[in-house]
Amino acid sequence: MVNELSFNCEDAWLNLFVGGEMYPVQVKTLMNPTTCGSYFRDVVKVSDAAIKVRGVQWDTAPNHIKFRVDIDRDGVLFRHVLQYLRNGKLTSLPDDIFTLESLVAEAEFFGLEKYREMLKKKLWKLTGKRQYYACYEDSD
């Protein structure tokens, strides 16, 4: 059963169940204004009274977190997405072209425009392909 749950603290934890992989994450990570994409802005709603998370289910995972949100995406790739949500610009990017291209699709799904630009910039540097050039604006 999918429902909405209210938290009174942004330090609360959720399990994100992505493509068969479990990712424990604090609600405040999903709310980070510098990295939060449109997907998580839709899932996490902040008001004066509470923080509401849509799509929460009771979790029977063997950790201390009792609530989870299911996301039908690639669970292995999501570890890179979560690293970006936690670290922003300091995120390390893989050097594998296939993984980078796959992450571009994940960034688009989650509405992470800055992450998408970082990935395309790295792809442009690795491949020199013009299709990635449009996002490359600075000189570093």
Swiss-Prot record:
Which species is the source of this protein?
Answer: Caenorhabditis elegans
The protein's matches in InterPro entries, at most eight in alphabetical order, are given as: SKP1/BTB/POZ_sf, T1-type_BTB
Q: Name one GO biological process term.
A: protein homooligomerization
Could you tell me what this protein is called?
Uncharacterized protein F47D12.3
Pfam families listed in its UniProt record:
BTB_2 (PF02214)
Q: Which residues form a coiled coil?
A: none
Q: List the disulfide bonds.
A: none
